Amino acid sequence: FFGYRMEVNRNYLKDFPIDKYVDFVVQRQHTAWDWTKAEQHGKWIESAYLSAIQRNDKALLDKARTMLKRIVDSQEESGYVGATSKDYRSDERPVRGMDAYELYFVFHAFITVYEETGDKASLAAAEKLADYYLKYFGPGKLEFWPSDLRDPENRHKSIDALSQFAGHGVHYSWEGTLLCDPIARLYEVTGKKKYLDWSLWVVGNIDKWSGWDAFSRLDSVADGTLGVDKLQPYVHSHTFQMNFMGFLRLYRITGDKSLFRKVAGAWDDICNRQMYITGGVSVAEHYEHGYVKPVSGNVVETCATMSWMQLTQMLLELTGESKYADAMERLMMNHVFAAQDCESGTCRYHTAPNGTKPHDYFHGPDCCTASGHRIISLLPTFFYAENGKDFYINQYLPSRYDGKDFAFEISGNYPESESMVLTVLSSKNKNKILNLRIPSWCKAPEVSVNGERVSGIEAGKYLAITRKWE
């Protein structure tokens, strides 16, 4: 099932008319507000590279390399590589309102390509783009205000405007501050402190820019005294989750536990109140009050599915707590592929648990069609993890893993059948510790090694199997 749906996704990426969207970017004539054309190339590049590498698909990889080269070659000397017209931009207005959101995915695409292939040109392009933002935004420079109001006049004011630099004003600066994530990631890759300092500056000003102390009040969410939906007048799921990933990245770098607490507390609140039984989140793209989760209409946005999955994976990596892997399993088994047309590969904008969608509902491309292909391409990066001698099986599906010093395969028809067989094929490190996720929903888990039952199994935990593998 997984392999087939990933193949459908790969074929969709091959056939997707990415040329015209790359044309749109490199021609650089865009002045309108619309963002859907200018976010396609970033998501497609990352998706295509990952999908091609996973299956050694030369045709797709060649196409991805060609498109990437066109984009990188078009980068201006200043570092700008978005779609906005040069005539539109100036020192006082160096970006379009939706540039930050569009370029978020370009940043991640460049860095992913570098990490997967070692392509230094991609890393250089990411640095040049980051330096463009650092040149114009920072202490004493331009800031991510969501409207013309400034502190303190913006305190507790509802906004319905289009921000000059931070996307939709109704996001209260968070559609600009989301750049803290890829630029902090750039610090992780390069070690250049200017990128860390800039990301910390961004996060440190969210309260001021939003006018609602939305960042600080995440502590109240963590305390259980405030719902995440009450942080500001409109809490856009996908946008908040992109920012949350930046906060977690900064926690990983700095060790600031307050950042982790904010995000983990928000995740718990969302999971307990706003996550559907199918694992998805968002009602008309935002978080609702109480336990309101309509099962029809515009609910469970695919962009939110993508960032919720990524955010949950980051929390799993940081904590090793299986509740995060359980949530990812629920989402992966249900809403991720429910959003995909199993024939054409196109992904939906919203996927309600109830009702039907006509064939022509698969429109686009838009933000969500591209997000659907990106999350499917990212899936293999969530299945397993390795940390020194420890190897973690986070998700169960028929598959084969061939690592540098460890190889195994999993067979069985999970989840239709709850029995799976994991066969270790080779292990150069004979003392590898195999950590198996025991799902919390599994009431009577059983594990055997070479026919011998293992004791001490606890649902909702990882079971560590230590032995000398042959």
Regions found by a protein language model. Give the residues of each.
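Glycan-recognition and catalytic cores of secretory/periplasmic carbohydrate-active enzymes
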Residues: F1-E470
